[in-house]
Amino acid sequence: MKFSDSCAACMYDRQCAKTDNADYLKKIKDILDNRPADITSSELVMQFNELHEKYIGPLDDLSAEKKEYNDLVLSMEDDIRKDIEASVDPLATSIIMARSGNYIDFAALDSVDKETFIGLFDNTKMSETEMEVYDSFCRQCSKAKSFLLLTDNCGEIVLDKLMLEQLKKRFPNLEITVMVRGADIYNDATLEDAKYVGLDTLGTIITNGRRMAGTVYKMLPDKAKSVIDNSDIIFAKGQANYESFAGEGHHAFYTFLCKCDLFINRFNVPKLTGMFVEE
């Protein structure tokens, strides 16, 4: 996905709100002003984080928040599973509910609160446009042998697990692989988190090999590239995966909540509107 001048301005403003360290902010501005045309936000954030550790100190430790939301959604798991299985189309419902978990994003949102998160479960219906994408998704899954899930946040991955349960029920021949982050970055899910919530019971877990929020194909280890290249279906969660992976030459389905102005304006929807797209 093309990185725009408005994204650059937003990223710089967010750094200014975080610190008044003049040397750090000058370096950030230099990176943004001289960025390559094809760079992704995920790559820029990696550079920012390296500078943060050099000029300011370690990045915020969100391990407590990660565990808090993993535990919160795990405590809701049985009730959510019952709601999914009682619905007219459990797979469709599970996709919408898994997307609701995309709200748990301490990088994109200034604040995350449990009431807003829980309120997102009130609407589990797909729009007419989303149903067209869903029909395409099901048609392709019925013919596929391999399925790759690109995950995003902690807490959200519990809902991803419930989605994968329904996927395996509908399409039992699918071989499932789940890709998580290669190291702690914000509240994104890692291998440890995936095992903690039980995602490893539904598929093979691999990592993107980096401390990177997103999926930048050219920066992935060979194993991750091979899995992407050989997966019949790629299902990517969250804004960061869309920003870094869409338009890079691989067909994929994406679902996310629109949390920043770029997505709100691109899709012309209110904040926190869910999207299900195929590209």
Regions found by a protein language model. Give the residues of each.
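Electropositive, gly/pro-rich neighborhoods at or near active sites that engage anionic ligands
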Residues: 2-144
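Short, hydrophobic/aromatic alpha-helical segments in well-folded domains
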Residues: 136-140, 150, 163-166, 223, ...
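Residues at the starts of beta-strands that form the adenosine-phosphate
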Residues: 145-146, 173-177, 251
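Structural motif
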Residues: 146-148, 232-233
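Gly/Ser/Thr-rich loops at beta-strand to alpha-helix junctions
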Residues: 152-161, 183-185, 239-243
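Histidine-anchored nucleotide/phosphate-binding helix
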Residues: 153-172, 177
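Short connector loops at secondary-structure junctions
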Residues: 176-193
